[in-house]
Structure formats: C-alpha cells, structure tokens
Design a protein with these regions (language model features):
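Juxtamembrane helix-loop boundaries in multi-pass membrane proteins
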Residues: 12-24
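Short, Lys/Arg-rich, polar N-terminal cytosolic tail immediately upstream
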Residues: 1-15
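Hydrophobic transmembrane alpha-helices and their membrane-interface boundaries in multi-pass
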Residues: 23-113, 137
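Membrane-interface helix-boundary motifs at transmembrane edges
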Residues: 11-15, 63-77, 118-130
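Alpha-helical transmembrane segments and their interfaces in multipass membrane proteins
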Residues: 33-53, 71, 96, 119-178
Length: 178
C-alpha cells in the first residue's frame, strides 16, 4: 500500500457524533485549564475561580457526551456553554482590557454555537437560539468594548497594568484558541 493510500484511509474514517462532542468538550476543559494557570500566575483570583467552574462544566459535558446523552438535552448544554463562554469573555475584557483579545470569544461563539444547534436541535429551537445568542453577544460585546473605551480595566485599577510579556502571552493564546 502506498503512502498516499494510507492517508486516504485515515481521512475516510467515520467518527461518531459522541466522539466529536466529547473531543470538543475536553478541548474546552483544556483551554480553561490553561486560562486557570495564567490567571493564577497573574493573581486574578476571581477568574481562577470562574475557570475552576468552567473546567468542571466541560469535564461533566465530556463525560455525558461519551454516554451519547448529549443530543437529548442539546439545547440546554449548548446554552450553558454559550453563556459560560460569553460571560468569561466579558469578564476577562472588563478585568484585563481588549489588548488581551478575550473579546474575540464573544464573536466566535455565534457561529460555533449555532453550528452545534443546527446539528442537534429542531428548527424552532435553532431560530430561538440564533436570536438569543446573537442578541446577547451583541450586548455583551458592546458593553465590554464601551467600558474599555471609557475606563481602565479593573485589574489595572486594583493591582497593576499587565506587562507587555503577559499581554502578548494572553493575546497569543487567545488568537490560537480562536
């Protein structure tokens, strides 16, 4: 068998939905574990606590996906994940400012969450989710960017401005994860 034939065989693998959802959930847990470490290093403890919750949410979701129960309550899980991501993005933008690029997650949530809704929910739920998630994303993004325009980030107010290396590290991680 030639090398190109082997590659084609790998690309033709059929991967079940539960494996895809499980991989996405554990990827989310890994991302938040990374954020947890970064926030612990810069001593932003409110976000450390938030990320402990986030890691737990994604691990529970990953375990549920393994049992293939995800699609029965897909709208609830997608909504929980959406609001976790949107709130995390909003709080990080308030605490750390737009230079760290956490606001990108607010924009990223719309296509990603709507894709999951499209795959798992009825048309009525999809339309409701589209409207709700888009409106919430617009409101949170507008509020965070307006706050950042007129005020210093909370972390700067209570602690210190981030160093250029800290800002670059967070920006790099956020762009890579988005």
């Amino acid at each position: 068998m030639r090398n190109t034939d082997k590659r084609r065989d790998i690309l033709d693998l059929k991967i079940g939905k539960s494996v895809k959802y499980t991989a996405a959930a554990f990827s989310g847990a890994f991302m938040h574990l990374t954020f947890l470490v970064i926030f612990a290093i810069i001593q932003l403890y409110i976000m450390v606590i938030f990320n402990v919750f986030s890691v737990g949410l994604y691990i529970v979701l990953g375990l549920i996906c393994k049992r293939e129960n995800f699609e029965r309550r897909a709208y609830n899980w997608v909504s929980a994940i959406y609001f976790e991501i949107a709130l995390h993005s909003f709080l990080c933008t308030l605490f750390l400012g737009v230079n760290t690029c956490f606001f990108l997650y607010t924009m990223m949530t719309i296509p990603v969450m709507l894709y999951y809704l499209f795959l798992t929910c009825e048309k009525k739920m999809f339309k409701r989710g589209t409207f709700l998630f888009s409106l919430c994303s617009l409101a949170l993004l507008s509020a965070a960017l307006t706050f950042d325009h007129f005020c210093d980030p909370f972390f700067y107010t209570f602690r210190r401005p981030l160093t250029l290396n800290e800002t670059d590290l967070m920006r790099t991680i956020n762009i890579a994860f988005n």
